[in-house]
């Protein structure tokens, strides 16, 4: 059983004005001037004499790159021309991938995002056991006005959000004032429906809870936009969900730029995994995995890896190389780790995986304890790997000799070796696995699950995530 009283198998099986927006990637910064705009498809007069415009958003999808979603009313009217305020509430059992992706993408877009706890303390344990630290308690948000309020799902997180009276009032006011609001996964059915906020709204949600949605208005799409409301299906559609909201707030140019940084591309439809010198990774015991992290690590990567592996019944330890259990990840997400690296080093691990993030990678490289752990992992023939810029950590420690790898495509990265595999999102060479990171990290994590347990386990986990697993 997991720490929330749910077994991992249960979790896995849950089947517009000119403005400046500063886009930040983990590998550097890009500043650009953006003119947010939506293409108007038609104008329909309402009974109140106002106009309603149908708008079309075109976003590439991990499950259907040609997907088109339609806005059926005016949306995205913010509180100011330069700053968009966003609220992301979290509670005990919130789906951490969904929460962290929302925060990450919207902050990259330039939004002022507040993470608020509906519990009595700031520290909140997610549905897969990752502990997040909110910025404020929800009571601090009661009198604030937000351009967007977006609810992550997860169980029992969606129930905890539903039972918060302050949040209910905030959401109802948001809908009444016709400002943007959204929900993903279980949240549409479990949270918004009891509040009466799905009335006459086309809605989607997690397949396991789809039957709870109003039949006539429920649709099986990854993203559904109906007026001010945007809904989505699960962790595997989190990036689409967040990008859709970013586009509604900041415009298509901003959303497309972030999409490129995050590596959301056609590889989702045509997987680009490469394996060389294949060996058996299966074990006769529960796999033990160490994920070392630091200030500046990519929150999306570390949270996604831990979440996916825990769904697959892997024993995961997230360890800080800092002096504190608390780290501040890239884009400001605050995470409470399981152990300090010194304590973690007292045990041995079947896999050690380094998440990326430029600053985080530099701090991981400086850890003498981690360097020793990695050398022991290499010398014993056990598995290790990295995502994003952290492949350079392995390279500088001499752990990628004669190994084929991949790394985040950045001009600032020095060539690691002559065996870089161009175009590959995940590369496995014997007992070493590397990935481009960011939006490809779910594929990376599922590749690990497949190597440890086989395709059937990986496919089962993928279904719970609402992420398309490639046919074998």
UniProtKB/Swiss-Prot annotation:
Compartment(s): Plastid, Chloroplast
Deletion consequences: Albino phenotype and seedling lethal when homozygous. The phenotype is due to the absence of thylakoid membranes and granal stacks in plastids.
Chief location bin: plastid
PfpI endopeptidase domain ranges (all copies): 84-250, 287-453
Annotated Gene Ontology cellular component terms: chloroplast
Keywords: Chloroplast, Plastid, Repeat, Transit peptide
Note: DJ1C lacks the catalytic cysteine residues in the endopeptidase domains which is a highly conserved feature of the family. However these residues are not essential for the function of DJ1C in chloroplast development.
PANTHER family hit by this protein: PROTEIN DJ-1 HOMOLOG C, PROTEIN/NUCLEIC ACID DEGLYCASE DJ-1-RELATED
Family, similarity comment: Belongs to the peptidase C56 family.
Described purpose of this protein according to its UniProt entry: Plays an essential role in chloroplast development and is required for chloroplast integrity and viability.
Protein name: Protein DJ-1 homolog C
Organism: Arabidopsis thaliana
